[in-house]
Amino acid sequence: MNIEDAVTAVTADANALTSCLGQPVVAYHVTEIMREADLEHARQMQLALMRRSIEALVDDGLEDAAAEQFASQFDGRVGSAWKLLHAADGVAH
């Protein structure tokens, strides 16, 4: 898996998020997370994106619980893609 494939896989089902934050913004942040080789730093970046995602979804009219659930699923896809991308790097997961 390469970075472009990882970003595509993560953002494929993120229409609600890309509509309120914008596809380029979401793709940029996911790309930066995928480029980060350090697990801890990647996770911090992921958590920041998750918080921002929840805020944007709520601002866009989604209920808090629904926004948190969507962001949690999105966060899971980001984490899974990061692990697949970096599996061959010998990075401790």
Model-derived features with residue positions:
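Short intrinsically disordered terminal tails
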Residues: 1-9, 86-93
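N-terminal acidic leader/helix
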Residues: 6-44
